[in-house]
């Protein structure tokens, strides 16, 4: 089934450093994508880009493709305007592919808003990030069990989120998360374990210290309303997963982690 736009929906962004400041070198988008004017706030020297959508949410047949290229030393935070609502679907699916390319010294923080999969929805997302020496990459995701406040919990059809990360041409991280409520007990052990929201975050760069991991563990352990797991990857990174009962709460925790990272 084709989406209402009749074609793949694309967003392309390229950023560079000019006079010591990250700026937008090139951009291109098709419906429903739009991007707001870049803005600069906070610390870290990031150019903040907000991705907007003219659609009410993700619909059956939607096919999204986001490509980001960062030149040497560019620092970009890419975030969404509002929650990503994945609407009910008859028989089809919706897909999204993200491609990120980071040159030497570049830093991308990919921070989409929380995702809410409605009943009978099916969504497939794949992300590929290619990092050159000296670059850094953060990704995060918050997934709700559904429209929780309406009592719609784990009634989506399928949800898939996959990510591959390459550093200097070497595959250093691969993860695939498949959620199928009809065949999996998503409220049980190994899944949401009685919680309604899940946050995931990964940070990848060559300098990941044990002191950083210890600091994050101490901070998260002190939070009694969530459960978490944090592990260093085989090379150049760590991943943390947090279970809670509120998107706002998990967003605030991810913000605290980011404040430690940069």
Curated annotation (Swiss-Prot):
Major subcellular site: cytoplasm
One GO CC term on file: cytoplasm
GO MF assignments: nickel cation binding
InterPro entries for this protein: UreD (IPR002669)
Regions crossing the membrane: none
Keyword Chaperone: yes
Keywords: Chaperone, Cytoplasm, Nickel insertion
Pfam families, alphabetized: UreD
Subcellular location: Cytoplasm
Alphabetical list of HAMAP family matching this protein: UreD (MF_01384)
Quaternary state and interactors: UreD, UreF and UreG form a complex that acts as a GTP-hydrolysis-dependent molecular chaperone, activating the urease apoprotein by helping to assemble the nickel containing metallocenter of UreC. The UreE protein probably delivers the nickel.
Chain's role: Required for maturation of urease via the functional incorporation of the urease nickel metallocenter.
PANTHER family with a match to the protein in the record: UREASE ACCESSORY PROTEIN D
Family per similarity comment: Belongs to the UreD family.
Annotated protein name in UniProt: Urease accessory protein UreD
Lineage of producing organism: Bacteria, Bacillati, Bacillota, Clostridia, Eubacteriales
């Amino acid at each position: 089934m084709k989406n209402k736009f009749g074609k793949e929906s694309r967003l392309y962004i390229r950023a560079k450093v000019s006079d010591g400041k990250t700026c937008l070198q090139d951009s291109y988008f098709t419906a429903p994508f739009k991007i707001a004017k870049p803005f600069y706030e906070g610390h870290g020297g990031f150019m903040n880009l907000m991705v907007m959508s003219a659609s009410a949410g993700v619909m059956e047949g939607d096919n999204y493709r986001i490509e980001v290229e960062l030149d040497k030393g560019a620092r970009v935070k890419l975030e969404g305007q509002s929650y990503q609502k994945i609407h009910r679907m008859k028989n089809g699916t919706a897909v999204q592919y993200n491609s990120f390319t980071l040159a030497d010294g570049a830093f991308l923080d990919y921070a989409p808003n929380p995702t809410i999969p409605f009943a009978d929805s099916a969504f497939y997302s794949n992300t590929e990030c290619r990092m050159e020496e000296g670059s850094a990459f953060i990704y995060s995701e918050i997934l709700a069990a559904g429209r929780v406040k309406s009592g719609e919990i784990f009634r989506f059809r399928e949800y898939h989120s996959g990510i591959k990360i390459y550093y200097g041409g070497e595959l250093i991280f691969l993860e695939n998360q498949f959620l199928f409520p009809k065949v999996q007990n998503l409220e049980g052990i190994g899944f949401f374990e009685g919680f309604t929201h899940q946050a995931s975050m990964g940070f990848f760069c060559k300098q990941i210290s044990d002191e950083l991991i210890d600091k994050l563990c101490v901070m998260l352990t002190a939070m009694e309303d969530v459960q978490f797991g944090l592990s260093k990857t085989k090379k150049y990174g760590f991943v943390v997963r947090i279970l809670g009962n509120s998107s706002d709460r998990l967003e605030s925790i991810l913000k605290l982690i980011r404040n430690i990272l940069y």
